[in-house]
Amino acid sequence: MLAAALRRCTAAAAARGLLHPVSAPSPAAAVCSIRCYSHGSHETDEEFDARWVTYFNKPDIDAWELRKGMNTLVGYDLVPEPKIIDAALRACRRLNDFASAVRILEVVKDKAGPHKEIYPYVIQELRPTLNELGISTPEELGLDKV
């Protein structure tokens, strides 16, 4: 039944002249598209960090933007710098979102992967912020044993 409906729609579109054969792009267009992607400025590590710190320091950030930012940041092949995590934790505190703060710390531990020295370093750098904001680590909450 669906196939018959699709054939009728295709036949009607062809009768009205809406279906045109797609021509292959010319070789010049293919070369141009390749060249267009080879240029552009590359973001330095400092610019990357500043962009994310600014994002999380927005005074009007809401819970959705916080989660979107963290999901995007986690998608990169890196462990975020402590100053980015600090800004994200402060955003969680402004939103009174303790669960997201703990989840951010869990994600940092997960992103560190087999490099066991990264997560303790990040926690060491964030310890003053964690104490100031009253945020417990997943280990302090016993979540690492679950």
From Swiss-Prot:
Q: Which domain of life is it from?
A: Eukaryota
SUPFAM superfamilies documented for this protein: Cytochrome c oxidase subunit E
Gene Ontology BP, a term: mitochondrial electron transport, cytochrome c to oxygen
Q: In which tissues is it expressed?
A: Expressed in the head of epididymal sperm but not in testicular sperm (at protein level).
CDD domains from the UniProt entry: Cyt_c_Oxidase_Va (cd00923)
The protein's PTM annotation reads:
In response to mitochondrial stress, the precursor protein is ubiquitinated by the SIFI complex in the cytoplasm before mitochondrial import, leading to its degradation. Within the SIFI complex, UBR4 initiates ubiquitin chain that are further elongated or branched by KCMF1.
Q: What is its main location?
A: mitochondrion
Gene3D superfamilies membership:
Cytochrome c oxidase, subunit Va/VI
User: Could you tell me which residues form the transit peptide?
Assistant: 1-37
Query: PANTHER family annotated for this entry?
Result: CYTOCHROME C OXIDASE POLYPEPTIDE, CYTOCHROME C OXIDASE SUBUNIT 5A, MITOCHONDRIAL
What's its job? Component of the cytochrome c oxidase, the last enzyme in the mitochondrial electron transport chain which drives oxidative phosphorylation. The respiratory chain contains 3 multisubunit complexes succinate dehydrogenase (complex II, CII), ubiquinol-cytochrome c oxidoreductase (cytochrome b-c1 complex, complex III, CIII) and cytochrome c oxidase (complex IV, CIV), that cooperate to transfer electrons derived from NADH and succinate to molecular oxygen, creating an electrochemical gradient over the inner membrane that drives transmembrane transport and the ATP synthase.
Instruction: State what protein this is by name.
Output: Cytochrome c oxidase subunit 5A, mitochondrial
Source lineage? Eukaryota, Metazoa, Chordata, Craniata, Vertebrata
